[in-house]
Amino acid sequence: MIPTYKQLTPFLNLKTVQTDKFKTERFSVCIIIPPEERLMPVSRFVFHVLKRGCKKYPTQRELNVRLDDLYSAAVSTRFWDGIGSCKIGFVAEMLGDEYTDGSVFDGTVELLFDMLWEPLLDEKGYFTSKNVDLARENICDSIRSVINNPRQYALKRFWETMYEGDGCALPRSGTVELIESVSADEL
């Protein structure tokens, strides 16, 4: 498995890895951001809102029906961090085309790009308040739940202690106060 790289634009690179070992395919789209206290959680917030719907599939139900049509393909948000930069984006996983009618990969990529480039917006050009509020509620619940999960809490404390003074020590999802202060127009 040797990766190949292709620069599509000055700011967009494509990395592919061909293998016959798996029956599934994976596609990810990510942005690289600096580990800044407000930028990291707000960027994650944006991806959580994007995942709630797009023009073509405006509700979670319609998105899920489309994913079911694609042989139960899955789209999730991911966050990778390192020293000096963080990556945030979508990861799509689907059954390999050789095991289907051959259109699952293309359909999943199309759906992912609809979510990114044709998001569900209100008449002012902002994310809909319903999707922003639902994403905010989910993120805040997730932040609050860390204290009740010993493994997540230990990992959080590890990052805070190990990387004190570095961007990596910042809470990846932010704080409840920060997330509650973010408005739809800021996103």
Place the predicted regions along the sequence by residue.
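Histidine-acidic residue clusters that define the catalytic metal-binding segment
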Residues: 1-7, 157-187
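N- or domain-start disorder-to-order transition segments that initiate the globular core
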Residues: 1-26
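M16 family metallopeptidases and their MPP-like homologs
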Residues: 17, 23-43, 60-114, 151-174
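Active-site SXXK
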Residues: 43-52
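Catalytic Zn2+-binding segment of zinc metalloproteases
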Residues: 51-59
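Acidic/histidine-enriched alpha-helical segments
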Residues: 64, 118-144
